[in-house]
Structures are given as structure tokens and as C-alpha cells.
């Protein structure tokens, strides 16, 4: 996860390789790169930002980046964001999934050319699809950078805030597998 106070999707990152291994031939077809926790300082303190108080999901070089104390003075001025930037440059992903949580409801959001993946995820999970332009702005976000700036499909899985992480994984396992296996 990117936000330290959003643990709902973390089990999915640990369980996905095992789930894929149970599908014949899946591991031979897929290269999977998993980051369980991009924000260990925030996770340890159960806060949104990192140790510098910066929201790492607003610190990417998207065209809509806005400097500020909570977002960073410039894109990638936080070591965690810089590390992910370097990883993306090295791995050149064909699809990115990121887990967050939202108060009061769950949904899947997408940026870039990811509509078919969002529809597939929604079909298998029952999560409604929320378009980015119908949500509050997220300047400098991972979705803005990966999806809009780089043109790589990205799904943001917004789990219900406070939900049980194991239940969240079990509820979305088949949807995540369907998306990953279709990429």
C-alpha cells in the first residue's frame, strides 16, 4: 500500500503469488512484481503520509502535480516515490494494480487504457466502477502518473475502510486473478 493507514489490501499482495501458482501455467506466462508496503514509516505509525508527512500518492511526476507541504515540493522528492519511479522504469509494467481504502464503500477506479480491466474486475467482484473524473482530484497520484502520463493501465482497488483484510482478499481474489491473467 501507499497510505500507511490503509491496510485492507495488504494480504492480497502476500497471497496473490500463491493464488497464481495454483493456476496451471500462470507463473510461466506472467512476470509479477509486488510491493507490499511502499510506506513502511506510515504503516508503522498508522498514518497516511510518510515520516516527512508527505502523501506519497501525490508525489509522482504526473502533469497535474501540485507542490505543497503534504505533496512534496517537487515530484519524486520523497525516497519512496523515487524508488517506485525507478522500479517502474526498470520493469516497464503492462498493468498496475494498487490497493487503497475508502470510507463508506468499495469500488474500482482506473486511469489510462484500463477500462476493460476495470469492467472485468467489477464483473468478478461486484465492485462498482468509479471514473476518475467523478472523484475528488488526485494531483500527482500514482494513477495520474502511471495511467495518464505513461499510458499504462492502472486499477485502483478501493476497499471498504476498516474491512477485514482477509475478507477483502477473499472477496476480490477471483477478480484480481481474472485481471492479472487477462493482461
Language-model-derived ranges and their functions:
Residues 2-134:
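Active-site/substrate-binding loop(s) of hydrolase catalytic cores
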Residues 106-108, 136-183:
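Active-site-adjacent mobile loop/cap segments within catalytic or ligand-binding domains
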Amino acid at each position: 500500500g501507499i497510505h500507511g493507514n490503509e491496510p485492507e489490501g495488504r494480504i492480497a499482495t502476500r497471497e496473490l503469488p500463491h493464488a497464481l501458482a495454483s493456476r496451471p501455467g500462470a507463473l510461466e506466462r506472467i512476470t509479477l512484481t509486488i510491493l507490499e508496503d511502499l510506506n513502511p514509516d506510515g504503516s508503522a505509525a498508522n498514518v497516511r503520509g510518510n515520516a516527512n508527512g508527505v502523501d506519497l500518492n501525490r508525489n509522482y511526476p504526473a502533469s497535474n502535480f501540485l507542490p505543497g507541504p503534504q505533496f512534496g515540493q517537487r515530484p519524486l522528492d520523497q525516497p519512496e516515490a523515487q524508488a517506485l519511479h525507478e522500479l517502474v522504469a526498470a520493469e516497464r509494467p503492462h498493468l498496475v494494480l494498487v490497493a487503497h481504502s475508502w470510507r463508506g464503500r468499495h469500488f474500482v477506479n482506473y486511469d489510462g487504457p484500463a477500462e476493460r480491466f476495470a469492467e472485468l474486475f467489477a464483473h468478478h467482484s461486484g465492485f462498482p466502477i468509479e471514473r476518475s473524473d467523478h472523484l475528488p482530484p488526485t494531483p500527482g497520484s500514482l494513477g495520474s502518473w502511471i495511467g495518464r502520463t505513461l499510458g499504462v493501465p492502472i486499477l485502483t482497488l478501493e476497499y471498504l475502510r476498516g474491512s477485514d483484510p482477509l475478507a477483502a482478499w477473499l472477496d476480490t481474489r477471483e477478480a484480481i486473478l481474472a485481471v492479472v491473467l487477462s493482461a
